[in-house]
């Protein structure tokens, strides 16, 4: 028997063993012996890990989590979900689409308001960048954004879209967000914020795609440019100015549209950062913000190590929210 055939046979035997074990565990859960089944899963997890059977451990924990979710055993399911991540961390598993989809499946089944869900997504994002402290893998952000969009959690969805490379998906989500939750008078503000945030992350392509797609798809925006709404014209001109990189054009543009830019006090904060990134404006002494909002603002404004991340914005990711 060749080495390859031997490995295949070994893999098949392992899979058969996992299936037999899963059958016993499923029977315990179906009988309602949730605690006992949970402890059995954990025991098997540590046994597999001690034998470096990482694939078997991950598969068993993933299927176990799905089983507990199907019986609405949120705590046990969340615990096994965390063990899935632990396997990936300890085995230094590669970031593959199939694995990311599995992680987001677990995320989607967790109670939307549970602290376990927050901990899970934070840890998953960290793993997806090899624990480098960067903002997370763009594909994972995209999948999270799509899941949160389905839940109509638009602000968190936007945060993840911002750190993905899916400007088109972001725009379509914002159209729905604006139409379902926003005032008609604010139709331009939804996209303006997104464009400015993409630019703060030095993602010109994302900014351009979100702007063009949003203005094309939104039922309340007449065909342009030029647009009826001055703020949309400002965004259009800004994207052109960013490509040109001329400070005088940027300065005149901000001056011309000052009345529109007063509608949200954050616009000038964003524009200060954009001026530094694209037009050579020296940085101001930036204020320090706290909390989740502060994390977003500090990353957008380039505080600390986040500044380096902006250079790689289309390869990085992490959750963000700004209303």
Curated annotation (Swiss-Prot):
GO terms for biological process: tail-anchored membrane protein insertion into ER membrane. Residues 303-323 are annotated as: Disordered. Belongs to the GET4 family. Keywords: Cytoplasm, Transport. This is Golgi to ER traffic protein 4 homolog. The gene is get4. It is found in: Cytoplasm, Cytosol. Component of the bag6/bat3 complex. InterPro entries: GET4, TPR-like_helical_dom_sf. It comes from the Eukaryota. Pfam families: GET4. GO terms for cellular component: BAT3 complex; cytosol. The keyword DNA damage does not apply. The keyword Plastid does not apply. Residues 304-315 have a biased composition (Acidic residues). Its main location: cytoplasm. As part of a cytosolic protein quality control complex, the bag6/bat3 complex, maintains misfolded and hydrophobic patches-containing proteins in a soluble state and participates in their proper delivery to the endoplasmic reticulum or alternatively can promote their sorting to the proteasome where they undergo degradation. The bag6/bat3 complex is involved in the post-translational delivery of tail-anchored/type II transmembrane proteins to the endoplasmic reticulum membrane. Signal peptide: none annotated.
């Amino acid at each position: 028997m060749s080495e390859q055939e031997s490995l295949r046979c070994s893999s098949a035997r392992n899979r058969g063993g996992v299936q037999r074990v899963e059958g016993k565990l499923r029977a315990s859960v179906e009988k309602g012996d949730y605690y006992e089944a949970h402890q059995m899963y954990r025991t098997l997890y540590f046994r597999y890990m001690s034998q470096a059977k990482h694939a078997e451990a991950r598969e068993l924990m993933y299927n176990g989590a799905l089983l507990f979710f199907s019986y609405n055993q949120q705590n046990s399911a969340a615990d096994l979900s965390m063990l899935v991540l632990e396997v990936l961390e300890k085995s230094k598993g590669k970031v593959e689409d199939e694995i990311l989809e599995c992680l987001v499946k677990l995320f989607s089944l967790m109670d939307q308001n549970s602290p376990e869900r927050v901990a899970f997504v934070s840890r998953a994002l960290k793993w997806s960048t090899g624990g480098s402290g960067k903002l997370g893998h763009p594909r994972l952000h995209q999948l999270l954004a799509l899941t949160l969009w389905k839940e109509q959690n638009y602000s968190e969805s936007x945060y993840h879209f911002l750190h993905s490379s899916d400007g088109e998906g972001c725009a379509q989500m914002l159209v729905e967000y604006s139409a379902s939750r926003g005032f008609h008078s604010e139709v331009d503000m939804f996209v303006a914020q997104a464009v400015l945030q993409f630019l703060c992350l030095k993602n010109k392509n994302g900014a351009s795609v979100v702007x063009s797609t949003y203005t094309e798809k939104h039922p309340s925006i007449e065909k342009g440019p030029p647009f009826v709404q001055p703020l949309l014209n400002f965004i259009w001109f800004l994207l052109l100015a960013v490509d040109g990189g001329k400070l005088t054009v940027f300065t005149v543009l901000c001056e011309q549209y000052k009345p529109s830019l007063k509608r949200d006090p954050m616009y000038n904060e964003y524009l200060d950062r954009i001026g530094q990134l694209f037009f050579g404006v020296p940085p101001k002494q930036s204020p320090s913000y706290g909390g989740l909002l502060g994390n977003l603002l500090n990353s957008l404004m380039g505080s600390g190590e986040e500044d380096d991340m902006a250079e790689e914005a289309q390869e990085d990711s992490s959750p963000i929210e700004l209303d």
